[in-house]
Amino acid sequence: MERVGFVGLGIMGARMAANLARAGYALTVHNRTRSRAQAFAQEHGATLAETPAEVGAGSDVVITMVVDGGQVEEVLLGEEGVTQGAAEGTMCVDMSTIAPSDTRRIGAALHERGIGFVDAPVTGSSPKAEDGTLTIMAGGSEADFERARPMLEVMGELIVHVGELGQGQTVKLINNAVAASNASTLAQALIVGKATGVDLGALIRIMGAGSGASTMLTLKAEPMRTHDYSTLFKLEHMLKDVRLCLEETQAAGVPFPAAAHTGEVLAAAMGRGLGDVDFAAIVEVLEGLADTRL
């Protein structure tokens, strides 16, 4: 088995790394908040690294699950980054969601050092990370993907090699923009139902049985209806992903009006201080526009 390093033990990362530990991989872990990494190491028998460079020195494959491209670059290429300790032939797998252009740039720098790179962002919330049933879309060479596959299969249920380096990120961003737009449309539908006196339970059942069915309906209708924004995926992270998707559409010269509108609504929710709660809180802004409370 490859020795695996894991950097980024947040809501998703800790659960993903735990599945690798349970599968028998020898883990070296690092987290910006040291106490999280220390607790994880004690619980799962992992080695605690003080810096990403130490992770690189003790690993054949290094997985990153952090917030944005700046963090990925710092973790992999910074003064105390993975490349400061990693040997030639090491491979890095970034499972964060970042700009495809950042992925390609970081990948080029790694390849100059003889280090492979795969971008493998995920879809699915923390329960799926816990169960190892995430959907993973991977970009990179066929050889690098096949090397990463055994570890990805521990963390995910559906693993798809979508193309060259960076295309995993592109697919993920499009998917999340669709999900966010769907959630916004769902919130609007519930508000219309409330304003017109419709029984919301009946509306949700009918939509779920017909052409209005969606994953967002299943996951977010009741939280929106009850204003329960327990965090499965932070609103600020969804806004980041939608904005990154819109950067891609602008570069390609194509419109994505649904995502553009949803980005504005998410930004308004951020302005209300809702960034740290679940993106189901998008309903708060739309309730305000309609002057109707679910």
Language-model segments: what does each one mean?
Residues 165, 169, 213-279:
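Interdomain hinge/lid region at the active-site interface
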Residues 4, 92, 97-177:
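Rossmann-fold dinucleotide-binding core
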Residues 271-294:
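NAD(P)-dependent dehydrogenase/reductase Rossmann-like domain
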Residues 52-115:
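Rossmann-fold NAD(P) dinucleotide-binding segment
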Residues 1-65, 90, 95:
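NAD(P)+-binding Rossmann beta1-loop-alpha1 motif at the extreme N-terminus of oxidoreductases
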Residues 27, 48, 117-118, 159, ...:
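Hydrophobic beta-strand scaffold residues
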Residues 132-139, 160, 164-196, 207-219, ...:
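Active-site-proximal catalytic alpha-helix in oxidoreductases
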